[in-house]
Design a protein with these regions (language model features):
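HotDog/MaoC-like acyl-thioester-processing domains
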Residues: 1-60, 114-119, 128-161
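Short coil/loop residues immediately preceding or within conserved phosphate-binding loops
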Residues: 6, 71, 108
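A short, structural micro-pattern
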Residues: 18-21, 68, 105
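Short amphipathic
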Residues: 66-78
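A conserved acidic, glycine/proline-rich C-terminal tail/linker
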Residues: 102-127
Length: 161
């Protein structure tokens, strides 16, 4: 659809039961101008259309918990860079997981990417918790949010801070 792509992903166990379901929305961006562009027909044919999976679809934007606290600063390292020369989407999740207690059983992961980090940039990491949610904001040194990661958890013995 125009410059937007939608993808469902299912991972099944050996018996065929769904163990992970995911939905994602993507913007097709011109890497030179960093502007959305219409999806080219040959790209569209590489991803055939299918029916949406029956599942809960979260809103596109993550509503932030109000009291975010800075917990760390990190530099983007070469191994976190993908083929587009920016921080790989998975690296944001892996980084957030470093600040999650092993007592938290993660039930859902959401992420909202606003602008990519590149090698050598400083990531200001902020964290907030409320009930069963743990959120991270990855911002630049000017305070601009680049990515939000949210975990929905089941508490397994730890107290909320």
């Amino acid at each position: 659809k125009g410059s937007m792509g939608y993808r469902n992903i299912v991972i099944r166990d050996e018996s065929g039961a769904n163990i992970v379901q995911a939905a994602s929305q993507w913007s097709y961006i011109d890497t030179e101008t960093l502007r959305p562009v219409r999806i080219e027909p040959e790209v569209g044919t590489a991803y055939p259309l299918a029916e949406k999976l029956p599942m809960e679809y979260a809103p596109r934007k993550i509503r932030l918990i109000e009291e975010m606290k800075e917990i760390d600063r990190r530099i983007v390292l070469p191994y976190q860079i993908d083929s587009n020369n920016h921080m790989n989407n998975e690296a944001y999740i892996a980084l957030a997981l470093e600040y999650i207690s092993s007592d938290d059983m993660i039930c859902q992961i959401r992420s909202e990417y606003k602008r990519q980090f590149v090698k050598g940039e400083c990531i200001v990491i902020k964290k907030a918790e409320s009930n069963d949610l743990i959120q991270f904001v990855f911002a630049d040194e000017e305070g601009q949010t680049r990515c939000i990661v949210e975990f929905k958890t089941k508490r397994t013995g730890r107290q909320t801070a």
